[in-house]
Amino acid sequence: MRDLWIAPAVARPVSLPSPAPAGTPRRPGRRWPVRLLVAVLLAQMAFAMVTTAVRQTPTIDEPVYVGAAAEYVHEHRLRHNPEHPPLGTLVIGVGVALADPHVDPGFAGDQGQLGRHLLYESGNDPWRLMLWARLPVIALTLSFGLVVFAFARELAGPLAGLAALALYCFSPDVIAHGSLATLDVPAAGSVLTSAWLVWRARRRPRLYVPLAGPALGAALATKMSTLPAVPVLMALAAVSVWKASAGGLRLVRAVVGAGVVALTAITVVWVAYLMVDPRLRWTPEQHVPVVHGLRGLLVRLLPFPEVYRDGMRVQFGLENRPWQGFLFGRLYDGSLWYYLPSALLVKTPLGMLALWVAGAAVVVGVRRLRPAAPYVLAAPLVLLAAAMQGARDFGTRYAVFLPLFLAVAAGCVLMVRRRWVSVGVALLVAFAAVSSARAYPYYLPYSNEAFGGPGRTREWLHDSNVDWGQDLGRLADRLRDRYPGERVWLVYKGSGVPSFYGIEASDPRRVPVQEVRGLLVVSDSAAAKASGRLAELIGGSRPVDDVGHSITVYRR
């Protein structure tokens, strides 16, 4: 069996930097500046994420995950949120367990109601509970920064690693979603980790192929949208084992390598469910649609627990709903295939965009880097293509894997040994960093300078690109400080409970238009989709204030 893994002759990949000559000791003095810069970059990212998390109220999806996490930890039941596998929620559950909230085991309600009940109706402090729930995701996000650094360093040297890490640490999307108790960044980081380990398997397949599978399994056990990456990473594992082997069994070893990745990934998914409930009890408490055709066949063939397959059916059911989107000021029904590329153009710093394009070109065009191109570019391209076919045009979080993979590619630009290239990379990294830092602490509604910055993002995009319900606490402070005693009419899009934060407001859509006088407060996502009475109310009002670039205060 050992012969199936590796042959006596192992070729060293030409794309890796040449090691130091034999007998030449590595001087520790050369390492500490790099280590110091890595620590500084991660420390500033941690500061940005923690201080952002402290001030934000629950976003739309977070109560669902926090409620499910509490249920997993305290009741060990698979009842709610089947459309997402449990591993990412269990990570959130670590923070929930440390917060030790009061949990009502007898509560009956859907997953959204469960989260709101836990946060606002059970005697818990939602500020404290949400911070604890977010901290494990923040820690994971920081650890994925080390993967970005290590991947780029192995391809193009320590300076490339630092450039890649800087782009990662200053990515507004990564900071925004890495500081929330959600699943997008944990899933994306797990795919990146698997790709990096598969790349390393070109040298040591017996060590890294068995590690790449669990990393891929962690992604699959966190978000089902990572499934398209499975054949990509299996194929790359086969290529790595093939390259590391010699002799007549190369093809057999390559097939075994791909199989090991698949088998260990499947095992991780099963283990994640068994961690919640060793008996895998599953009785759906929500409608599970019947899926026909090729999709239905693929779901039935998945080698996962029935709850996972039902979750896939729920996801396909969500894809069939009549959603609305908002892009460049236009409200539309359905979805647009070019939505995600367009949204990324708005929400990515300009310097970062330039380095992404240059990095992809260098990885493909430079001969020494070309063997690494599939490992860096294939998985994100396949995931992006799959996401572009989705029915829900809700935000760049569906493509948050791009800032991770393309940061690695961008660092590889430094493989072009020209002084002007090094200067250009430094300037573009600095430009991206300054653009990101200027948005602090409003990373969720970030847009780059070409589109007017965070204050104008609501003109181009909606939902989690701008307003995900995160600023209800800031709104309460603003109303108390600037508008005490005034009549407030509120249209809020989010999962928070306004009255908990001291906001006494009425719904202006429930009374005649002429009775709405005073302050009209509208979430920007609601304003983007306004029609009928709400559109009339906004049209007859004048904006007087802005809260977090996600809520607009009008006066009537």
Each model region followed by its residue ranges:
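Interfacial juxtamembrane loops and adjacent helix segments
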Residues: 11-12, 74, 78-138, 281-333
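Specific aromatic-rich, kink-prone transmembrane helix
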Residues: 146-151, 186-203, 215, 405-409
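Short helix- or helix-capping micro-motifs
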Residues: 164-169, 196, 216, 220
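Hydrophobic, aromatic-rich transmembrane alpha-helices
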Residues: 148, 343-370
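C-terminal luminal/periplasmic domains and tails of membrane-associated envelope-modifying transferases
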Residues: 2-19, 25, 451-556
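Transmembrane-helix signature of polytopic, membrane-embedded enzymes
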Residues: 34, 105-116, 148-170, 202-203, ...
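Perimembrane helix-loop-helix junctions
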Residues: 197-205, 229-265, 278, 360-371, ...
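Signature aromatic-anchored transmembrane alpha helix within multi-pass, membrane-resident enzymes
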Residues: 37-40, 231, 259-262, 267, ...
